[in-house]
Amino acid sequence: MHSTEVQAKPLFSWKALGWALLYFWFFSTLLQAIIYISGYSGTNGIRDSLLFSSLWLIPVFLFPMRIKIIAAVIGVVLWAASLAALCYYVIYGQEFSQSVLFVMFETNTNEASEYLSQYFSLKIVLIALAYTAVAVLLWTRLRPVYIPKPWRYVVSFALLYGLILHPIAMNTFIKNKPFEKTLDNLASRMEPAAPWQFLTGYYQYRQQLNSLTKLLNENNALPPLANFKDESGNEPRTLVLVIGESTQRGRMSLYGYPRETTPELDALHKTDPNLTVFNNVVTSRPYTIEILQQALTFANEKNPDLYLTQPSLMNMMKQAGYKTFWITNQQTMTARNTMLTVFSRQTDKQYYMNQQRTQSAREYDTNVLKPFQDVLNDPAPKKLIIVHLLGTHIKYKYRYPENQGKFDGNTDHVPPGLSAEELESYNDYDNANLYNDHVVASLIKDFKAADPNGFLVYFSDHGEEVYDTPPHKTQGRNEDNPTRHMYTIPFLLWTSEKWQATHPRDFSQDVDRKYSLAELIHTWSDLAGLSYDGYDPTRSVVNPQFKETTRWIGNPYKKNALIDYDTLPYGDQVGNQ
């Protein structure tokens, strides 16, 4: 007599499905729920995170007996992406957006690691450990979600069709929208779910970079500025543009800050009548790439894409017959693959002074002084020299020699309630300003010593919030949560005796005018004596026809994101903020 053992078929379990959903939802929906509870956003983020996190159920349905392996592999990716977004929210109180990702991708991994070290704290470590522990606990509860064949294929396809294929088909074939627009809309819906915000952000970054690379490759094909005139003719001259970094004027004694952070510029201002200090210039965007796309071109907050289609300041000066130079102490990954490098390559000769593998290295801005001297001695009759500094860029203590920490441990004129770590950063920033003062003053002095015919303009690309605004707990820059200190910048003009002799002008009546750095190209054209179709004297801060207009700040690519800088609350301040 033979006996047969019948193996029972596995049954579908709602409990197993529930744990699988909870596991995948955890990585995205937790943060969206926190954002909703805080009142920062509505329910769309929760809805989309729930929907698109459910896509990870497809491999679980198709291979139920391998759920632990599948969930572990996918979970590591989701954990890393979602933890980064959660920590960003803890630090800034804002959602991790594509705009932030764009800045991260452009600044390169070395700079990103420097940001991580700046914000590394016990609080972040504890949050990360707790977050990881919950994720691991949920993973241990996973069991096979068994759906009989062929229904597992039907359910999996239904998920894929409902969330991905149907929106694409509907928008592309029924509504006749461009396929690229359809993908952009879908990516926007998927963004609240990890790790799609990283993938869509990188996709947009590559698109933007390709556009700029194309602009560089086709630079000679751009039509020159029409009806172009240079009132100075062919007389030899040298013009200098110094671009600072992360330096807000409210922390400069030159602008009334009680700590002596700019002694050399203070002395120059008192003794040299040719140095003009403008008191009311603000940047339009608190990020280097985004503001230089405006300051060095005809783009602005209302027309942010003109940098792609119209000549830049570098193109304009080459059209005027200048030999152009770019000297930078900003880190460059390669000579061609960053947006800053695209701008620099529009000049005739470049000096890349920072070759460190990591930005967390003591590579000081005094690096630019020797090549600056070399370029001053170049025999070209007409020269434009652009100098790009690291300035007071985070991490501040790397911007000055270790033995020059004048304000280390100093508690004078410090906001109340700072922790020891915050006080250290506050003082480091002032030390960085002190060293930046030496570099900028040295550039002016070296330029003056060359007995040039020309002028020098210095500004910082944007400011920096370093516990300046009550409740004194914010450091860095966040366009979605702006403070005045993120936008207030120094703006200096030094003119040589020879230039003044042939271009006599009194700027004393101009120094308090409200001005946006986004309009720089018009001021530069005015100073250089250039005119052309598109030049607008009402947008030059040194022109008698100047008209004050709204100083827009914010992300111009985000709906209803532009705001008037002058509506921002003041908080604590010094000087003209």
Question: Can you name each region flagged by the protein language model?
Answer:
Residues N403-E424, K473, K498-P504:
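Flexible internal linker/loop segments at domain or repeat junctions
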Residues G256-E260, P452-N453, V457-Q500:
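Histidine-centered active-site microenvironments of extracellular/periplasmic hydrolases
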Residues L57, K370-Q373, D412-L456:
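A long, amphipathic alpha-helix that forms part
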Residues Y40-T43, R189, E301-P304, Q356-Q359, ...:
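Active-site rim elements
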Residues M1-M190:
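Transmembrane and membrane-interface helices of multi-pass
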